[in-house]
Each structure stands twice: as structure tokens, then as C-alpha cells.
Amino acid sequence: MLTREIIRRVREIQLRTGRQVADVLAGEYVSVFKGTGVEFDEVRPYVPGDDVRSIDWNVTARMGEPFIKRYVEERQLTIMIMADVSASQDFGSAGRSKREAAAELCALLAFSAIKNDDKVGLTLFHSEIEQYIPPRKGQKHALRVIREVLAHGLSDSEEATPKLSRWRRFLNKPAGGLPFLGELGFRFSRPLRPARESTRIATALEFLMSVRSRKSVCFLISDFLDEGYEKALVAANRKHDVIAVLISDPREFKFPSIGLVELRDAETGKVRVIDTASAGFRRDFERQSLERVESLERRLRKSGIDFIHVDASGSVVDPLVQFFRMRERRKKR
């Protein structure tokens, strides 16, 4: 992708999301995240009316008179954005790729953070950590976050690639790209992407734990075409406030009728031809795709992790607003 094109897209996203933050998200962000934590300020002598539960018994024993611990509300948050930049993020069937939707979501989060004088950081990952930008404040920094997400998109030659070729690249992921085909163990017969561009969510979460000692609000943005990351996710959520954001495309649920497709078994090498025009194939594909998302959401919620589902072809703002309002209702209980 040309640098000129990246700049154009960043400016476009900045204009669109800037208005949305000002008009829609400003109050939602503050009501959900501000004041959700406290930090230690000082120890001072107890005075009548103080909460006895705040007494510091160690200091009281040493000084011979009661002292209390004083806490103040945390006035600054750190928002950590962890964005999956593996090959499947390039897929898009409705004029916008999952990567572009993720970039717009990153912009909404980054601009909401800097508007409230909070820091925002970014980690880009696939099977490895691609890039880490430490948390900072300021609009210039927020624009860099958006630019880096977009910069890991399609190359110039790929921008002109027909949609069918994009389907081939997407289906070539080691996990099958699409759950129904992945469970069958099939992939397209010719490899089209380097293996390093698969997704390893556990690697990203372990990296987060190593670089962030203080609690952060972490948005994990991915299509979650991975396995074996649940343990790392639960561990990260104990230390941080982790929010899982699934980015999907409508075609991941409704396979197009593109005729006969030759697939190869990833383990045996056996080639099989599938008729994508078959109503039965498309029906089973849709059912298993929906079941995958429902299962993912159940597992996350059972582990105490909030879940946001963003359709790359639709509004990015609406799911975020719904999440903020859900959090606000829960906070008031």
C-alpha cells in the first residue's frame, strides 16, 4: 500500500471518527472507565468520621495511635490496543476489509482516550509480535496508532487482486480460515501466504503481561481464528481489564456460490473438489460459522471477559456504544 494512500485513509478515518467521538462516545467513555479504580495516596492520622476499614494496622502499631490509608480516584487510564494483523485481516467482501474496520475501531478508542487525557498504546501481532508502541498521550500519537494498523495491510499489487483471490488467501490460513473447512482439514491446494502470518493470540497476551506492570484497559481485536489461548487470556484478565473484540465479515457466514473449488487436506495431502453452489454445503457452512461465534462468546463470558462483535461491513460505532452502555448498567448495580 502506498504511503500516500495510507495518509489519505488516516485522514479520512480521523475526520469520520473525530466527529463520532465528539457526538456519541465522549460521555459513554467517561461514564464507563473513569473512576473505576483507586490508587494509594498517603497515610494520615485517623480523625472521627473516617472509615475504620481504612485503618493501617501496621502503622498504627508502630506509632501508637490510629492511622488510615488514604486513596484517591485514578485520574488517568492506559488504553492498550492489541490488533491482529495476520493474513485473514486483509479479507473484505463489502468494500472494507477487516483490517480497515479494525483501524477505524482503533481510531475511536484512541481519540476517546486522548480526549480524556488518557494514554493509548498499540501492539500488532500475528504468530509473533510485529510491533509495539508504548502508551502515550496526544493526537499525533493517536494518528500514529491508526497509521500503523493500516500500514500492515495489503501491498500495492494485492490491492488489485480480484475478490476470488482474496477468498483463496483467506481460506489458506492454517486453521482453515473458515471454521467449517478448518474442521474438515481442507485448504486450497496451493499455498498463498507465509506461515508466519497465522494468528497466535497467546503470544500477544504473554507480551502484554511482560511489558505492562500496571493495570490497563486492553482491547484485543482479532477474528480469533486460533486455539489454545484461553489460559493466557484468563491470566491477562486477572491483571488487566481485557475486552475481546471479534471482527468478522458477512462472507464468513455466507459462502458465495463460486462453483467448484479444489481443496487439499492439510494433513494427508488428499485433494477434494467441493461444489460451493450446493445449498447443503452453504447451509452447513453458515450453521457451523454461527456456532463458532456463539461458542467463543460463551467461553469468554464464562471466563469473565467482555465480548464485542463488530461486523466489518457495518457500523463500528454502534457495537462500541452498546458495550459502553452495558458496562455502565453493570457498574450501577
Where are these regions (language model features)?
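Exposed, interaction-prone extracellular/peripheral surfaces
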Residues: M1-Y29, P45-D50, V59, I68-E104, ...
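A positional/architectural concept
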Residues: F33-G37
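N-terminal low-complexity, intrinsically disordered segments
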Residues: R53-M63
